[in-house]
C-alpha cells in the first residue's frame, strides 16, 4: 500500500504478515513497525543524511557527517565509535576505531592523482603498497611482509598471469569471458561451460573431473564427483530446493510456506523436523519427530523487540526426557552479556570494538588490529603471535607451541608442533588447498590425527570444485 505521495506505508506478504512504514513531511522513512509491534525508528539531518537508527529496544546508533555529506563517525549505544577521514578528492584517507580509554586504532590510505590506492598503513605501522596501469588495474602489490605479487592482463583487462615468490600462475578464458584454465607449478585446473556460461565440468590437477548439470532455470540439478557418485537436487516452481539426494543415497525433502521458509524436513530414516515462525519471520519452534510419529525433542524460541533471542526452551518430549531453559541478555549494542541455563549464569564482556574480553571461563586480549593476542583460563595462558601481514605465526599454549609459515599469497603452508608433528599444505593456481601432508615422527600421541601412527605420514588429496568445496581422499603409510 502507498500513500498519496507514493510512499510505501504497508507491505503484506502472502502469509498475511505485514510491516507498516511511516514517513516525515519530506517523505523520509522514520519508522518501521512489524505485526508484533516491534519498531525501528530513523532520524535525519536537514540534508537528508540518516543521523540515527533506534532499534526495537530503544538502543540508538548515531551517525555524523561533514559539510559534503560524507560519513565521519558512527557511534553505537555502548559508546563504540568509528571515525572516517577523507582527502581533498573525496577518497577515504583514514579510519579510526576507538577502544577503551585513550586507545585507538587508525588505518590510513594514500592515493595517486587518478584515485588509485597507493599505500595502506595499518594501526601497527605495517604498509601495503600498490602500482597500477593507466586504466587503474593493479600491476604490483607488496604486502606488509615485503612479498611482491605482479599481475598482467589481456586486452579485455582480464588477469592472465600472477607472479610471486612461489612462481607464476597463468589464466585463460573463452570468448564469453569464462575462465577455462588456471595453471601453476602444481598443475592445471580446467573448466568447461555450456552455451549459458554455466560450469559443466571441473578437471583438477590429477586429471579427475567433477561434472554439473542444470535445469532450464539454471538451478543446479546434479554434481557428479570423481568417484562417480552424485548429489542430485530438485526444485519447486519458485526455485526453492524441494529435495536433495546425497552421494550415499540418503536424502532430504523440504516443505515450505508461502514465503519460501522451510516448515518441514523429511529425512531418509523416516524422521522429520518441523519449524514454526512468528509474524516477523523468526523461528519460534523446532520439533524433531521420529518415524513412529513420536516427538523426540523440541526447542521453542522467544525474542525481544530488536529480534534478539531472549529464551530457548529445550524439551525432550517422548524419548529424550530432559528439559532445559536458556535465557539470554544483551547490552545496548545487542551483544550477548549473560546466559542463564537452569539458574546458572555465565557473563560475557566486550571492549568498545566488540571483541570478547571474558566469557566466564577465559579472558582475552587483543592488539590494535583486533587480533587475539592471549587467552587465559584455568589451565594457563595461550599467546598468539602474528607477522606484519596478520598471519598467525605462533600459538604458545601451556602444553606446547605450534608455529606456522605461509605462501607468497599468505595461505597457510606449514604447521609444526614442538613434538615434531607437522602438516604441509599445497595450493593450486586459484589458491584452493589441494593437498595436506601430515607427518608424525616420534612417540608422543598428544595431537595426532587418530588414523596416523607413530613414525608415519599421511596425505589428504583435495580436488577443487567450482562451488568452493572439495572432493577429498586420504592415503597413509608407515
Each language-model region and where it sits:
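Short Gly/aromatic-enriched secondary-structure transition segments
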Residues: 461-463
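Beta-strand elements of repeat-based all-beta scaffolds
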Residues: 1-13, 17-34, 38-55, 59-76, ...
Amino acid at each position: 500500500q502507498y500513500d498519496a505521495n507514493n510512499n510505501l506505508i504497508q507491505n503484506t506478504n502472502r502469509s498475511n504478515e505485514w510491516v507498516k512504514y511511516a514517513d516525515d513531511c519530506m517523505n523520509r522513512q522514520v519508522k518501521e513497525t512489524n505485526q508484533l509491534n516491534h519498531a525501528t525508528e530513523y532520524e535525519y539531518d536537514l540534508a537528508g543524511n540518516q543521523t540515527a537508527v533506534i532499534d526495537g529496544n530503544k538502543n540508538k546508533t548515531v551517525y555524523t557527517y561533514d559539510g559534503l555529506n560524507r560519513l565521519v563517525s558512527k557511534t553505537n549505544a555502548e559508546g563504540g565509535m568509528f571515525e572516517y577521514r577523507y582527502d581533498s578528492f573525496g577518497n577515504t584517507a583514514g579510519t579510526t576505531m576507538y577502544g577503551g580509554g585513550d586507545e585507538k586504532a587508525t588505518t590510513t590510505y594514500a592515493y595517486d592523482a587518478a584515485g588509485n590506492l597507493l599505500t595502506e598503513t595499518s594501526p601497527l605501522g605495517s604498509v601495503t603498497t600498490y602500482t597500477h596501469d593507466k586504466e587503474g588495474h593493479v600491476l604490483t602489490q607488496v604486502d606488509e611482509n615485503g612479498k611482491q605479487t605482479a599481475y598482467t592482463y589481456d586486452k579485455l583487462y582480464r588477469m592472465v598471469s600472477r607472479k610471486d615468490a612461489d612462481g607464476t600462475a597463468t589464466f585463460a578464458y573463452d570468448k564469453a569471458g569464462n575462465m577455462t584454465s588456471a595453471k601453476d607449478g602444481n598443475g592445471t585446473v580446467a573448466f568447461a561451460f555450456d552455451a549459458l556460461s554455466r560450469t559443466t565440468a571441473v578437471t583438477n590437477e590429477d586429471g579427475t573431473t567433477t561434472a554439473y548439470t542444470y535445469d532450464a532455470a539454471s538451478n543446479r540439478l546434479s554434481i557428479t564427483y570423481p568417484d562417480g557418485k552424485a548429489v542430485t537436487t530438485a526444485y519447486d516452481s519458485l526455485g526453492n530446493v524441494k529435495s536433495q539426494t546425497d552421494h550415499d543415497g540418503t536424502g532430504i525433502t523440504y516443505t515450505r510456506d508461502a514465503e519460501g521458509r522451510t516448515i518441514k524436513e523429511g529425512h531418509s530414516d523416516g524422521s522429520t523436523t518441523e519449524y514454526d515462525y512468528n509474524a516477523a519471520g523468526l523461528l519460534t519452534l523446532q520439533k524433531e519427530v521420529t518415524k513412529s510419529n513420536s516427538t523426540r525433542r523440541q526447542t521453542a524460541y522467544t525474542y525481544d523487540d530488536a529480534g534478539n533471542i531472549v529464551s530457548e526452551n529445550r524439551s525432550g518430549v517422548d524419548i529424550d526426557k530432559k528439559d532445559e531453559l536458556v535465557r539470554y541478555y544483551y547490552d545496548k549494542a545487542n551483544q550477548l552479556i549473560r546466559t542463564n541455563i537452569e539458574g546458572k549464569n555465565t557473563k560475557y564482556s566486550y571492549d568498545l570494538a566488540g571483541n570478547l574480553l571474558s566469557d566466564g571461563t577465559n579472558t582475552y586480549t587483543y592488539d590494535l588490529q583486533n587480533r587475539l593476542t592471549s587467552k587465559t583460563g584455568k589451565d594457563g595462558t595461550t599467546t598468539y603471535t602474528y607477522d606484519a601481514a596478520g598471519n598467525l605465526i605462533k600459538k604458545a599454549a601451556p602444553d606446547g607451541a605450534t608455529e606456522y609459515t605461509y605462501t607468497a599469497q599468505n595461505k597457510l603452508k606449514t604447521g609444526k608442533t614442538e613434538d615434531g608433528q607437522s602438516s604441509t599444505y599445497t595450493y593450486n593456481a586459484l589458491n584452493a588447498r589441494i593437498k595436506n601432508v601430515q607427518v608424525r615422527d616420534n612417540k608422543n600421541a598428544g595431537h595426532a590425527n587418530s588414523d596416523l601412527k607413530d613414525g608415519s605420514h599421511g596425505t589428504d588429496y583435495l580436488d577443487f570444485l567450482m562451488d568452493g568445496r572439495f572432493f577429498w581422499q586420504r592415503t597413509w603409510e608407515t
